[in-house]
């Protein structure tokens, strides 16, 4: 796969990481103060590290990191619903990463 196609796939991943950061922060802020909100903020920081790694990789390949944000699941009015949405978002991301790894490896 050429660099431009690789960069395009990595930018899709980057957009997903940006969405994950915002989604986790929205959920943490909606929870207010407390241990669970702190845990969710910590997950958002981990997603920021993923974002940073992807952006550096894109630049290293001569590309420009996307400033678009992927889709988010922020609906719902309960912590349980928010957590279910977060898990679904992570599962979707894993599926996309696996597809991109296969595409880049070929």
Model-derived features: positions:
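Non-heme di-metal
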Residues: 1-106
């Amino acid at each position: 796969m050429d660099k431009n196609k690789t960069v395009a796939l990595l930018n899709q991943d980057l957009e997903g990481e940006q969405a994950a950061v915002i989604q986790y922060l929205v959920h943490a802020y909606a929870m207010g103060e407390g241990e669970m909100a702190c845990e969710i903020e910590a997950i958002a920081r981990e997603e920021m590290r993923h974002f940073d790694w992807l952006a550096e990789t894109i630049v290293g390949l001569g590309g420009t990191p996307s400033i678009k944000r992927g889709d988010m699941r922020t609906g719902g009015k309960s912590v349980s619903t928010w957590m279910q949405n977060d898990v679904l978002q992570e599962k979707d991301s894993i599926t996309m990463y696996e597809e991109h790894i296969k595409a880049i490896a070929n």
